[in-house]
Amino acid sequence: MEKNPDIQFRSPEEIKLYQEARLTETLAYLQAHSRFYQQMFKEHSIDITRIKKIEDLQQIPVTTKTDLQLHNSEFICVDPDDIIDYVTTSGTLGDPVTFVLTSKDLDRLAYNEYLSFNTAGCSRHDILQLMTTIDRRFMAGLAYYLGARELGMGVARVGNGIPELQWDTIHRIHPTCGMVVPSFLIKLIEFAEKNQIDHNTCSMKKCVCIGEALRNPDFTLNTLGQRISEKWPSLQLYSTYASTEMQSSFTECSEFHGGHLQPELIIVEFLDDKNLPVKVGEPGEVTITTLGVEGMPLLRFKTGDICYQYTEPCACGRNTIRLSSVLGRKGQMIKYKGTTLYPPALFDILDDIPRVKNYVCLLYTSPSPRDA
């Protein structure tokens, strides 16, 4: 993996040329080491030397979650002795998939989060309170710790849950930044209010949020984001988008206008149901090609997540592609009386009802031919 943190500030044309050079290296690596992609290239008569531009990726079939589940071990590109870490996906849309990482992959993971924290305006002068698990085969928790260490931040590894312990840590260590699932911030606020803690004057000034959307496609705060911001206006909220499969993340800058691509680490496409690129302004399925991964690199992997892309330059100075919060997962699309919607739209409504603390959404298919 090549570290080039300045590439995100280059022109879109320079970024594209840089990524195409890394793509050539990735294809050669897959041809040499991946049993799954060796078979794919053979079956589809793909000459990787002819794949020179990002647009040429359309000549290659996509990789799906089903491929990963059915052929998990065939994606591994390294000897077992070179594997340092084992993790699994969340299994949101099916059986969890095992991913393996080498020592260099862990370095890449650390660099990813270094870039992510940097994008969110963190520095070595910050102290991070890690409010996510670092165990249970969860890649991200370890990534956050490694990235904070690379940036030079101090870290308090509190883990998830236990509001009392979280507030005790805030009072003892005075962290300036939190890494957290945003809905847990509601629980921290409720605990503070019940225990006469003035959360608006505490040391915590920003949170990098994972796992749940905070914004609408127009960049305004959604219901969850509004609830947090109204109760804790002094806290800045930064959204991220990531997955185990991509081993990297998209993170908002201080403009809060979408998560920035990290060009050294992945190539992203936005595809329709026919695996063709959608136009800017149309929602598409996030499809990624990893760059610089040794253990289990992926080529044109369809994440199942539907997002918008933004290509205009950002006021922060970065010229990378940005993406919106997740509109929904392709496998969870609902058609109701001719209208298409995704579960997050329901979540946003339920999050706006104060008396609703927890909920489960159940979907049933009507026995009649029409949807209901």
At which residue positions do the language-model features occur?
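AMP-binding/adenylate-forming
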Residues: 103-118, 127-187
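Single conserved hydrophobic/aromatic residue that forms the stacking wall/gate
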Residues: 364-372
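Conserved helix-loop-beta element of the AMP-binding
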Residues: 127-129, 195-218
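Nucleotide 5′-phosphate-binding alpha/beta core
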Residues: 1-88, 94-111, 115-119, 230, ...
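A short linear hydrophobic-aromatic micro-motif
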Residues: 236, 357-363
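Conserved AMP-binding/adenylate-forming
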Residues: 216-313
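Residue-level signal for inorganic ion chemistry
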Residues: 30, 178, 268, 305, ...
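Adenylate-forming
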Residues: 301, 320-350
